[in-house]
Amino acid sequence: MTDTPDTPDTPMATGASSRPPLRALTPLEGRVVAVLLEKQFTVPDTYPLSLNALAAGCNQKTARSPVMSVGEDEILTAIDGLKSLSLVFEGSSSRVPRFEQNLARVLGVPSQSAALLSTLLLRGPQTAAELRLNTARLHAFADISSVEAFLDELAERDPALVVKLPRGPGEREHRWTHLLCGEVSLAEAPGLRTSASIEIAPSELEALRISHRELEDKVARLQALVEEMAEQLGISIDPDRLS
């Protein structure tokens, strides 16, 4: 086991932590190291993972965002990159190559934080409540506030490992995302586009204009019909009430 020992559900109050710069991971590198950490807790009997099991975890259809479809050659390339960062090791006690992760030790974070980071890598941006639910098999956080405490500590590190995203339209809670694959564009983060940022194609805009003109024509014809019927019935109608 390469993870740091468990600590209580409160980050150590030692101020903002710093670490040597770690290059941004590729999306596949992030997926590989996160799958290894996940499977270490969910299927410990098969950990360290074989290449075949690792590929299955990377291409898993559930609990993954985005869903990937990658081959073993691509995964081996990602493993080589992770080995160069000491984030992944290859075991030597089996005839079949097996791989294990070293995320917590390299980043200098407790196992609770590593669980949060791996879940963000696997599932994308999530609220603290979602993270508490989705990390349950990796670490059972006591409550949402303890999740937020670890997220805040990760955000205060130098460099930061996570960031809190602005609330999008209709969202009640802030979501968090990891920064292990580089900085994120808040304007392009999922669910954060506002109505002002929505682009309408020229053809769609012209169709809206035509529809608007047709609607105006129908209203005008109905108004004329009402006025004609009122005149036939001898009813006086204020034109302003029809506009």
Curated annotation (Swiss-Prot):
Gene3D superfamilies from the UniProt entry: Winged helix-like DNA-binding domain superfamily/Winged helix DNA-binding domain
Name of the molecule in the record: UPF0502 protein Rmet_3697
Transmembrane segments: none
Entry keyword set: Plasmid
Superkingdom of source: Bacteria
InterPro entries cross-referenced by the UniProt entry: DUF480, WH-like_DNA-bd_sf, WH_DNA-bd_sf
Keyword set includes DNA-binding: no
Region (Disordered): 1-23
Family label: Belongs to the UPF0502 family.
Annotated organism of origin: Cupriavidus metallidurans (strain ATCC 43123 / DSM 2839 / NBRC 102507 / CH34)
SUPFAM superfamilies: Winged helix' DNA-binding domain
Keyword match tRNA-binding: no
Chain intervals with Low complexity compositional bias: 1-11
